[in-house]
Swiss-Prot record:
Catalyzes the condensation of the acetyl group of acetyl-CoA with 3-methyl-2-oxobutanoate (2-ketoisovalerate) to form 3-carboxy-3-hydroxy-4-methylpentanoate (2-isopropylmalate). Belongs to the alpha-IPM synthase/homocitrate synthase family. LeuA type 1 subfamily. This is 2-isopropylmalate synthase. The keyword Metal-binding applies. Its cofactor is Mn(2+). It catalyses: 3-methyl-2-oxobutanoate + acetyl-CoA + H2O = (2S)-2-isopropylmalate + CoA + H(+). The lineage of its organism: Bacteria, Pseudomonadati, Pseudomonadota, Gammaproteobacteria, Aeromonadales. Residues 392-524 are annotated as: Regulatory domain. Its main location: cytoplasm. InterPro entries: 2-IPM_HCS-like, 2-isopropylmalate_synth_dimer, AIPM/Hcit_synth_CS, Aldolase_TIM, LeuA/HCS_post-cat, LeuA_allosteric_dom_sf, LeuA_bact_synth, PYR_CT. SMART domains: LeuA_dimer. Homodimer. Its EC number is 2.3.3.13. It is found in: Cytoplasm.
Length: 524
């Protein structure tokens, strides 16, 4: 049996299902490229049949990712598998992941079928997927609550049909470690062709046991773990990639296995996913929480000062957490910025140095001192605003006070034109938003508004995240500035630019459909 555990990341499929607002294609590609740098073996990036947008995202990622295998999900239905196969065709190598429920409650209550019907559907789905690729994964949904005899039959039939990987999900996070490990052990003991496939596990965290269940399964012979960055996912989330990766590394003495994960990329990848998905990481979260390497007890502090390994079993450096927080000023040159970015794990090709340096100088003039966390925030926001902006903030002014009606004046660049507007509102942010809505013509409803400091002290950058609804769709917007009113304006403009681009894509697709229909009519 191999001593390598395959890491199957499903942040962009199972993880994204938990988000209030869907990620854009560009944001999904950013995360996919980060996962590739991290060294995941397989990345499941969407469910192509679910929507044209998901199909496009899967296709775009499949076209760009070269060093990780791209995978798409499909129910055990021909149309799902065809959509996945078509979306993935552009990849150098890809996997189709098809699934069907196997527990009695799912088979009888959800599918309204017999287990024999489900068995036949699973086998047919695998054979259909093999038309597109020889790398087919099959999942027995709700395996944790499936009668063991039925589970053994399904696994044996799936392997015989040609599935290379068999996934055993604890779909509702119901099992405990000894129970789940026992299921894996029973499969190895009772399924005669088990050696012809890799056994995978996909554990949810409803009872807080997803990581423990996954590690226990590895001890019983499973060699693929399905997980997400920061453990994001439906309900209580999924098995956390960073936790299993560091467990397998730190306790290699006990577990005797390894992964291909580049552990120094963990912090950076976690931060990116948290930012783009608008899902803050809890401070006390293992590995990537803000307090993961903090010591407040006097006894602990004394021990760490004498020898770090008294209370630290892993180091901040091992996950890529920057330790040398050098302060920079407007007198710092480009070479300093480049050096600090390199020290934080950013290759020069991943950012525009001239653009970043310009943003740095502007911030340094406002703050005086700029720190690594400021620089990282600037780099991140430069990346998300790389696309041409149809609406751009040119000027913002507000007047407000305890006994003054808040008034705002805003000037936006709309295409090539400058448009001004003034408005009053229930506070300065509301007044600014009234101006922006009038200029752009979009009626936006703000569902969520969150403000957080990026950095330390009164001069910290203010980041604003909003979730907005427009015509039944949710959009996520972000803004960053030393002035929280300005960052609030940027966040709404970010949303409106996303809506505008989505409208442009929809119009183009409609024109293409009309053109195709016209050609078909003429040919008839």
């Amino acid at each position: 049996m191999s001593d390598r555990v395959i890491i199957f990341d499903t942040t962009l499929r199972d993880g994204e299902q938990a988000l209030a607002a869907s990620l854009t294609v560009k944001e999904k590609l950013q995360i996919a490229q980060a996962l590739e740098r991290l060294g995941v073996d397989i990345m499941e990036v969407g469910f192509p049949v679910s929507s044209p947008g998901d199909f496009q995202s899967v296709q775009t990622i499949a076209r760009h990712i070269k060093n990780s295998r791209v995978c798409a999900l499909a129910r055990a239905l021909p149309q799902d598998i065809d959509a996945a196969g078509e979306a993935l065709r552009v990849a150098e190598a890809f996997r189709i992941h098809t699934f069907i429920s196997t527990s009695s409650i799912h088979v009888e209550s959800k599918l309204k079928k017999s287990f024999e019907d489900v068995l036949e559907m699973g086998v047919s789905a695998i054979k259909h997927a093999l038309r597109y690729t020889d790398d087919v994964e099959f999942s027995c949904e709700d395996a944790g609550r499936t009668p063991i005899d039925n589970l053994c039959r399904m696994v044996e039939a799936a392997i015989k049909a040609g599935a290379r990987t068999i996934n055993i999900p604890d779909t509702v996070g119901y099992t405990v470690p000894t129970e789940f490990s026992g299921i894996i052990q029973t499969l190895f003991n009772r399924v005669p062709n088990i050696d012809k496939a890799i056994i995978s596990v996909h554990c949810h965290d409803d009872l807080g046991l997803s990581v423990a269940n996954s590690i226990g399964a590895v001890q019983m012979g499973a060699r693929q773990i399905e997980c997400t960055i920061n453990g994001i996912g439906e309900r209580a989330g999924n098995c956390s990639l960073e936790e299993v990766a560091m467990i397998l590394k730190t306790r290699a003495d006990l577990l005797g296995v390894h992964t291909n994960i580049r552990h120094s990329e963990i912090h950076r990848t976690s931060a990116l996913v948290s930012q783009l998905c608008n899902m803050p990481v809890q401070p006390n979260k293992a590995i990537v929480g803000a307090n993961a390497f903090s010591h407040s007890s006097g006894i602990h502090q004394d021990g760490v000062l004498k020898a770090k390994n008294t209370y630290e079993i892993i180091t901040p450096e091992s996950i890529g957490l920057p330790q040398n927080n050098l302060n920079m000023t407007s007198r710092s040159g480009r070479h300093v910025i480049k050096h600090r970015m390199e020290s934080m794990g950013y290759a020069e090709s991943s950012y525009d140095l001239d653009h970043l340096y310009g943003k740095f100088l502007t911030l340094a003039d406002k703050k005086g001192q700029v720190f690594d966390y400021d620089l990282e925030a600037l780099a991140f926001f430069s990346q998300i605003h790389e696309e041409p902006e149809h609406f751009k903030l040119e000027y913002l002014g507000v007047q407000s006070g305890s006994s003054v009606l808040a008034t705002a004046s805003v000037k936006l660049k709309v295409g090539q034109d400058l448009v001004c507007e003034a408005a009053t509102g229930n506070g300065p942010v509301d007044a600014v938003y009234q101006c922006i809505n009038r200029i752009t013509g979009y009626e936006i409803r703000i569902d969520k508004y969150a403000l957080k400091a990026k950095g330390e002290g009164k001069n910290a950058l203010g980041q604003v995240d909003i979730v907005a609804e427009y015509k039944g769709r949710k959009f996520h917007g972000m803004g960053l500035a030393t002035d929280i009113i300005e960052s609030s304006a940027q966040a709404l403009i970010h949303v409106i630019n996303s809506i505008w681009r989505a409208d442009q894509v929809a119009e183009q697709m409609e024109r293409n459909v009309t053109k195709t229909d016209k050609i078909n009519t003429e040919s008839v």
